[in-house]
Amino acid sequence: MRIVLLTGFEPFDQDPVNPSWEAVRQLDGVQLGSDVKIVARRLPCAFATAGECLTRLIDELHPAMVIATGLGPGRSDISVERVAININDARIPDNLGEQPIDTAVVADGPAAFFTTLPIKAMVKAVREAGIAASVSQTAGTFVCNQVFYLLQHALAGSGVRSGFIHVPFLPEQVAGSQRPSMALDAMVAGLQAAVLTAWHTPVDVKEAGGQVS
C-alpha cells in the first residue's frame, strides 16, 4: 500500500487547537485508490524539532507523496503554497520559546524551493467542490515555511512530490472578531479534494493563479 503523508501542526500561540491538525486527522486512513491511502501525522510547532519529526516520518513511512499543512492566521481560503524560502524570521516565539530572526533554514541552501505539486489543478478542484481556494505566493517565515523548505530540500531529486497548504482559523477561534475563518467540514472536504487531485494529476493545468502585487 502506497502512502500519502499528510501533516498538520500542534496548537501554538496559546490557541487550544490548530485547525490544520483538526482537519488532517479526519483524513487519516482515507484511500485515494485501491493501493494508496492517506496517513496523517502531527508535527510540533517548534523550529528545533519540526524538521526532525518530519524527517523521521519520511524515513519510517517511505511516502509516495507528502503534503504538509498549517494554520495561516488571516487566510480566508485553502491556500496552496507555491514557494518556500530559506529564511526564519519569527514574529512570535515557537512552542519551545525560540524566536529565530533572519536565520537560514539550511545554511548554504538554495534561496528557495518551488512546490512539486500541481497547485493550480488542486485549487481548481477545491473551488469546484464549492470551497474557497487560491494559489499563495508566500508561506510566511515561521515554522510552516521552515517545514515546507525542509520538506522540499529533503525530497529534491527523489521523484516524490511534495508541498504545503495553509488553512484558515476555525470559526470558534475567532468568535466575536472580524477575522476570516472556515468551518471544519469545509476544510476537510477542501483538503481531501486537493490531496486527491495532487495524487491523480501528474502535470499541472495552465491557468492564471498569480497576483498583481
From Swiss-Prot:
Its EC number is 3.4.19.3. It catalyses: Release of an N-terminal pyroglutamyl group from a polypeptide, the second amino acid generally not being Pro. Its main location: cytoplasm. It is an enzyme of class 3 (hydrolase). GO terms for molecular function: pyroglutamyl-peptidase activity. It is found in: Cytoplasm. InterPro entries: Peptidase_C15, Peptidase_C15-like, Peptidase_C15-like_sf, PGP-I_bact-type, PGPEP1_Cys_AS, PGPEP1_Glu_AS. GO terms for cellular component: cytosol. The active site is at E81, C144, H166. Pfam families: Peptidase_C15. GO terms for biological process: proteolysis. Gene3D superfamilies: Peptidase C15, pyroglutamyl peptidase I-like. HAMAP family: Pyrrolid_peptidase (MF_00417). Homodimer. Belongs to the peptidase C15 family. This is Pyrrolidone-carboxylate peptidase. It comes from Pseudomonas fluorescens. The gene is pcp.
